[in-house]
Amino acid sequence: NQSYKRSAIDQYKKTRKKLLMIGGGGSSEKIIREIRDSRGLNSIVVGILDDDGSKVGATIHGVPILGPIEELSEIKIPFDEVIICIPTATNVEMRRIVAICKSTGKSYRTVPTFSELIDGKVSMKSVREVSMVDLLGRKEVELDRTSISQYIYGKKVLVTGAGGSIGSELVRNCLTFDPSLLILLDQSEHNLFNIDRECSQNKHPVSFKPILGDIRDKALLHRVFSSFKPDVVFHAAAYKHVPLQEEHPWEAVFTNIQGTLNLMDASEDYGVDRFVLVSTDKAVNPTNIMGATKRVAEKLIQSKSIDSKVKYMAVRFGNVIGSSGSVIPTFQEQIRNGGPVTITNPKMQRYFMSISEAAQLILQAGAMGSGGEVYVLDMGKPVNIKDIAYELIRLSGLEPEKDISIEYIGSRPGEKLYEELQTNDENILNTNHEKILMMKNENGYNWDHLLIKVDEITSSAKLYDINKVMDSLKTFIPEYEPDYAKDEDWVKKTANKIINN
């Protein structure tokens, strides 16, 4: 009987997954302790690597710290998987660590960043695959929670586009500041259903009200504002897909311009304190309809701020990683289907940040504004789209150009090779947050003159004529340079396609 027990224990030890930890800090300690105290996990930690030389030779719960991370491929102890336990690692550090892990041929996973851990607890359950966010957008955001709390805690907060990529992340972050009411407005039934369900399952006991509706509907907005009287508006609802809006410019005008104006009118009538417009770097020297309409929206809030009790501000930033319809999910789908991965231009670059980072910085910028500011989020360095495609293919365990082919299809209408963060007549000023910059524009806009111009743009949109919409936008936004404005064949072809459909 004793020998049977011994052989069973030996067999159990053999079948346990041998883990090697990267990082000898608190996260490793928690996971080692959890594995030690829980037999159900069927794992054992055999060693730790850490770049802090003073830790080498020490142990954590009996597990030795063996040496620096770069020695991973030389480790003689057998192991099955690497767990990266550095939640504060930057994207640059993560790229280095992942490259070292790949050289071993063994599987590797990571603990989440602290911003992902709502309850702050690291555990084996929270360990996940390395994602593109880790390699591109893993930058921890230092928040002044007191200043954010001052304008959200106990207040009624309306989020438009509440079920979208940015809107839903704003909702999640707002929940942690305990508003008295969260009003979730979205015209997508599917998105609203999802964020409604998520809020109802949230541990934070915050009242919320989902509203299915469109910001184009002025009467609905006045009904919502008169019923709930929001104190704060986060305006994230917008049409954002560049090629689609090139073919349907009137839709961008009705939503991105007229919808914003409708919200502003309701905010004026019902005593909103703070209004934060979610904008885009595509509004800078725009070459596409989406960017031009968002630039008009920025001008609306800048002009209205001159003589309003509402504190209007805009927050401008680049691409968010994983946003619906954006390049990364598209590449991932192409890789799952066996390729090819389609890239518009090998030189194309974009700024990227994670959705959680963008939402947190929007909340922070919202605390700063006194009215009329356009804030720009520091996006770090632009990333080559080709590099992203290659990295995603490698993350899938495949080799670019070998397992998955790359196809260059040429830039689409309205696309720039490089995005910009400021217009020619804007000066960048620092704020008291290292990742938030402020645009100073000396050019004021007369509100009545602005309304006349906006009316001309919306009137042109009602004609459903691409050229007329582009011309009216160009008149108001002189820096708007449609990259195919002189291409009559493209305009005729697109117009015919729309009419025939």
Regions found by a protein language model. Give the residues of each.
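A solvent-exposed beta-alpha-beta segment
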Residues: 3-110, 114-119, 190-194, 201, ...
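Conserved Rossmann-fold cofactor-binding substructure of NAD(P)-dependent oxidoreductases
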Residues: 212-232
